């Protein structure tokens, strides 16, 4: 694995040890972080459009391979590690995600697969769909499998899940601030493994909209809102090195993080 350390993801000449920030190594060879963000936005938006409109068909296995395939397709123009698990542990604000070294990423993604395949999505009403979707997303968000692009990958995956139901997902109906806050609050409590999806249920109530044609096993082109909502701006995720201790957050209360390292979008 080439990317074993935090610093290895960055061009050395752009990396600032004091902040843990720099420009991620990329297939463009671009050293300017802002320019990279613009280029990434353009290419991944076009790829996302292909996925949500069914122009590219990925096997709907709802497992780790499915999630990696989405990420690999979205970021194939940008990073050589597209579709590959991150090699470092990361956190965002007060949220610390799955410990990749302890095998937690696969464990959480196995739970995602279990939840999706064990649910009769076509029979769910709006409230049931909102609760089931919130639980699936909470586990997927806690996995946070990739160094970059977890949010975009997760939204496409959730749209693939919604294809099984009588609903579509319109992410533009909630602000990025509401989405990010609900996602943060869904993380496990101290010393616990299980995410707490309660904060996400009202969000999915809002973004879940009736599907005109009912459940589908095909991508039906859920509209442009998902592409727009997935990329309203370049999002940043503050990350830090793992301490080697528990990978759950201290609590679900907002607080000031310490030891912030780097930026993940």
Language-model features, listed with the residues they occupy:
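FIC/Doc superfamily catalytic core
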Residues: 1-265
């Amino acid at each position: 694995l080439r990317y074993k350390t935090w610093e290895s993801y960055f061009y050395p000449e752009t990396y600032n040890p004091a902040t843990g920030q720099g420009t991620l190594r990329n297939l463009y060879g671009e050293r300017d972080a802002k320019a990279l963000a613009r280029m990434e936005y353009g290419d991944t938006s076009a790829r996302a459009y292909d996925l949500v409109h069914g122009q590219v068909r990925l096997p709907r296995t709802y497992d780790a391979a499915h999630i990696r395939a989405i990420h690999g397709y979205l970021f194939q123009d940008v990073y050589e590690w597209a579709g590959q698990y991150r090699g470092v542990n990361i956190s965002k604000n007060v949220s610390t995600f799955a410990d990749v070294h302890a095998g937690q990423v696969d464990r959480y993604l196995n739970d995602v697969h279990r939840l999706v395949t064990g649910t009769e999505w076509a029979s769910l009403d709006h409230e049931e769909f909102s609760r089931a979707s919130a639980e699936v997303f909470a586990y997927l968000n806690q996995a946070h499998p990739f160094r970059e692009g977890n949010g975009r990958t997760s939204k496409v995956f959730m749209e693939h899940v919604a294809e099984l139901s009588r609903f579509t997902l319109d992410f533009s109906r909630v602000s990025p601030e509401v989405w990010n806050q609900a996602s943060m609050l869904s993380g496990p409590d101290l010393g616990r493994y299980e995410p707490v999806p309660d904060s996400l249920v009202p969000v999915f109530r809002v973004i879940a909209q009736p599907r005109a044609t009912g459940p589908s096993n095909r991508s039906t082109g859920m509209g442009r809102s998902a592409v727009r909502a997935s990329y309203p701006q370049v999002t940043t995720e503050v990350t830090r090195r793992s301490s080697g201790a528990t990978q759950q957050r201290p609590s679900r209360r907002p607080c000031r993080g310490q030891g912030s390292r780097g930026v993940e979008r």
